[in-house]
Amino acid sequence: MSRCAGVLMSISSLPSPYGIGTIGKAAYDFADFLKKSGQKIWQILPVGPTSYGDSPYQAFSTYAGNPYMIDLDFLVRDGLLTSKDLEGRKWGENPEEVDYAQIYETRFDVLRCAFKKFRKNNPKFKSFVKENADWLDNYALYMSVKKNNDMKAWTEWEDEDIKLRKPEAIAKYTAKFKSEIEFWKFVQFMFYQQWADFRK
């Protein structure tokens, strides 16, 4: 095995005007810098959606990507947002620290703006949903029910049937939260599109 050098840095530590690093231009620039400086490895922290405490090692899902890492400027480029959608938003007071509470409030509001403009019959989206149904359906339902329960841990949900994943409860909530489930699938589609482009 030949010797090589690398860097350990979380994507969340990249510079960003939106309170936290993303897989946007700063990520590409940093990767280019590493290549030019002879680095062979960029080790990152897990990129799953963080839960209470915002630790990358405590995620809601093994498979899902972190919505915070979706680059909003790329969504503007793709016509899902406008610069006006981002004007006046609060991302935290200290540019050297991540204000997760503020980002949670702001980012999902912005992503919902993008979702409203997204064409649900997009062939790539439909293909993504179909190919990842084994984890995506459950994840999107889980996040929808969790949001309906004020983001409480599933052990604190009021409906025992959905906590136990009884088939009739799954069918009930899948129908009830159809639009919300589509939103969470959209978020994962956006993450994985940007992630795949970056890793090319």
At which residue positions do the language-model features occur?
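Acidic/aromatic-lined carbohydrate-recognition and catalytic surfaces
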Residues: 2-200
